[in-house]
Swiss-Prot record:
Major subcellular location class: cytoplasm
Function in brief: Cell wall formation.
Tree of life domain: Bacteria
Phylogenetic classification of the source organism: Bacteria, Bacillati, Cyanobacteriota, Cyanophyceae, Acaryochloridales
Annotated positions binding Mg(2+) 2: 303, 305
Record's protein name: D-alanine--D-alanine ligase
Cofactor: Mg(2+); Mn(2+)
Gene: ddl
Cystine pairs: none
Record's keyword terms, sorted: ATP-binding, Cell shape, Cell wall biogenesis/degradation, Cytoplasm, Ligase, Magnesium, Manganese, Metal-binding, Nucleotide-binding, Peptidoglycan synthesis
Single GO BP term: cell wall organization
Residue stretches making up the ATP-grasp domain: 127-336
Length: 343
């Protein structure tokens, strides 16, 4: 039996294009390691920032551009791919759009399907699902861009509401961007109005969350119908918050795996992660972010990432390495889970 042909789909049109390329390079290396070299043949498919798909010999940003005629065509090699491994982050990647395309192709693929991916990308929908099953989370206010731009008086009323319900500091986020893109911390009315304008330029939907003094913890989930949770890790940093630069610049943030927290807190986080994974109808993989408030003992779920990063700085593969699963074995498991899910 020949090697399984894995379509490694990376790049994309979002602001997280470069992160996707770095993740794909790490995944390609894992597929070449050990037994995986005999199991799999990686077919790199690069999505340019204008949407063109290109077959490349290796993972990276190729020189030049694809021909104009390729805008609405897939490379011929696409027809030979047995299973897809999409690692396209952000909008048009992990929001259900790529997943819907792969469903139309009738090919198995790594990760969650259309619905779970879309819910996981939209922070407002995500928090609605978490709330529906009773998961504890920080207070938040959901807004539409039209709420801000339709009437100056209404704008002021919205700011009054945010100050009353959430107070300061608070965090303003575009609902559908990942990797902390477009997030602002507001400590007063002036910063709040600026933050709302920034978020509204990037997304039609905006979420404002109450600030909380807490430790930031993460847990990785792997599986389909019977998922498993990893050890819990902690992120610490010296910046105001865990923004894009902090997240992807070496040395800006420190990962502590496993986190030094009470065993009961670790078990609670692992249990909540599995509950959330199953409530979303997720498949394959996801990473869940939490706040732990030592002064009260509270554990609050913050977000899910249904297609987490796989760079050298990324928490997801490191959490599984600390749980006894190497990077090469992790990508092998993910492909097998994809084949199982789509059988």
């Amino acid at each position: 039996m020949g090697r399984l042909r894995v379509g490694l789909l990376f790049g994309g049109r979002s602001r997280e294009h470069e992160v996707s390329v770095v993740s794909a390079a790490a995944i390609a290396q894992a597929f070449a390691a050990g037994d995986n070299g005999d199991r799999y043949e990686v077919i790199p498919i690069y999505i340019e920032k204008d949407g063109r798909w290109r077959h490349t010999e290796r993972v990276g940003i190729p020189e030049g551009t694809a021909p104009e005629s390729s805008l609405w065509q897939f490379p011929a090699v696409v027809d030979t791919i047995d299973v897809w491994f999409p690692i396209v982050h952000g909008p048009n990647g992990e929001d259900g759009t790529i997943q819907g395309l792969l469903e139309l192709m009738q090919r198995p693929y790594v990760g969650s399907g259309v619905a779970a991916s879309a819910i996981g990308m939209d922070k407002i929908l995500m928090k609605t699902v978490f709330g529906a099953i009773g998961l504890p989370q920080v207070p938040y206010v959901a807004l539409q861009r039209s709420d801000l731009w339709s009437d100056p008086c209404r704008y002021n009323h919205l700011c009054d509401r945010i100050e009353t319900e959430l107070g300061y500091p608070c965090f303003v986020k575009p609902a559908n961007l990942g990797s902390s893109v477009g997030i602002s911390k507001a400590k007063n009315r002036q910063q709040l109005t600026t933050a709302l304008e920034v978020a509204a330029e990037l997304d039609r939907r905006i979420i404002v969350e109450a600030g909380v003094v807490a430790r930031e913890l993460e847990c990785a989930v792997l599986g389909n119908d019977k998922p498993q949770a990893s050890v819990v890790g902690e992120i610490t940093y010296s910046s105001e918050f865990y923004d894009y630069e902090t997240k992807y610049t070496d040395g800006r943030a420190q990962l502590h795996i496993p986190a030094e927290i009470p065993p009961a807190v670790s078990e609670q986080i692992r249990s909540l992660s599995l509950q959330a994974f199953q409530a979303l109808g997720a498949a394959g993989l996801a990473r869940f972010d939490f706040f732990y408030v030592p002064s009260t003992g509270e554990v609050l779920i913050n977000e899910v990432n249904t297609l987490p990063g796989f760079t050298a700085l990324s928490m997801y593969p490191q959490l599984w390495a600390a749980s006894g699963l190497s990077f090469p074995e992790l990508v092998h498991r993910l492909v097998q889970l994809a084949l199982e899910w789509h059988a």
